[in-house]
A protein has these predicted regions:
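Alpha-helical transmembrane segments of multi-pass membrane proteins
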Residues: 59-71
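Flexible, solvent-exposed coil segments and beta strand-coil junctions
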Residues: 36-37, 80-84
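Short, glycine/alanine-rich hydrophobic alpha-helices that insert into or span membranes
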Residues: 53-61, 104-107
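Interfacial helix-start motif at the membrane-water boundary
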Residues: 83-103
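Long, highly hydrophobic alpha-helical transmembrane signal-anchor segments
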Residues: 103-121
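Interfacial/capping segments of alpha-helical transmembrane domains
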Residues: 68-80
């Protein structure tokens, strides 16, 4: 319980920090219009996306022959008995799952209650990206049925079609990494969203967010739960989930999800009471 309390405290600190940043630090942030009014003209998928996807696939294939090497190196007594590495891996693992989801939902809830549009916007779109990444990852895990290194560190080639769908078969749901996907989905969503508010901020926000996501991925390798190629493919899925969710919402500002959850209908009645409802349209 003490360990869980420590994780919760860190999440509260991180969420508070993100909230202060998102609510508008400095006059530049305050002078900019609400993010939800920004309409992107970019197509959902571009040629650049194809090149990025090919890069991730190439990286996954390139690392595959080295999976066993990295797994062995990380499981040496020197690394596993290092208290600093143990604590760091535990913290980042929690930040990946369930921490990222807690932060996303928390930011959305606080943003709605406090009427901080940007915080609610980021929380909602970030949470959507996490759910999309998680759904995709779990589908691929079930199909691939790859054995985790903790099942047999000498057999990185153990793939059995559909094995990951069987109940109680978590040891055979290694590819791709869910924690990695969640970390990179959060990083991509935050980077994409904030780049629309503060175009010149990407140079420092992106390294911080993607650096944290990389640490989440590395923690799973350290814990012997994933091979190197697992975390690269998880990073690919998360990155695309985060960027595409944000791009979709900003190119379709009238979509139902944003209308329902970011812009509820508020009506003041003659008796002075206020009614709040969802702005649902029917066609």
């Amino acid at each position: 319980m003490a360990g869980l309390g420590g994780h919760v405290n860190k999440l509260l600190i991180l969420t508070t920090g993100l909230g202060l940043a998102v609510s508008g630090i400095g006059p530049v942030a305050q002078a900019q219009p609400a993010d939800t009014t920004h309409i992107s003209r970019d197509p959902l998928f571009t040629t650049k996306d194809a090149w990025i996807a090919m890069g991730f696939v190439a990286g996954t294939i390139a690392l595959y022959p080295a999976d066993r090497y990295f797994a062995r190196k990380l499981q040496t007594p020197h690394n596993q008995e290092n208290q600093f590495l143990q604590n760091t891996a535990t913290d980042f693992r929690f930040m990946g799952t369930p921490g990222s989801l807690y932060i996303g939902v928390g930011m959305y809830a606080v943003g709605r209650v406090a009427r901080i549009d940007r915080m609610a916007d980021l929380g909602l779109h970030g949470t959507e990206a996490l759910l999309l990444a998680s759904t995709t990852v779990n589908l691929v895990k079930g199909i691939a049925g790859r054995a985790r290194p903790m099942a047999d560190i000498e057999n990185e080639r153990s793939f059995v079609l559909g094995r990951g769908f069987k109940k109680g078969n978590d040891l055979y749901r290694s590819f791709p990494s869910g924690h990695s996907a969640m970390g990179f989905a959060a990083a991509a969503a935050v980077t994409s969203e904030t780049s629309k508010w503060w175009p010149n901020s990407t140079w420092f926000i992106a390294p911080v967010m993607y650096g944290g996501a990389t640490m989440i991925a590395a923690s799973r390798m350290y814990n012997n739960a994933h091979w190197a190629s697992d975390v690269v493919m998880g990073a690919a899925i998360g990155t695309f989930a985060g960027t595409k969710v944000v791009r979709y919402h900003h190119s379709h500002p009238g979509n139902r999800i944003d209308k329902w959850l970011l812009h509820p209908h508020v009506e003041k009645k003659p008796d002075g009471t206020v009614a709040v409802g969802l702005a649902i349209e029917t066609h």
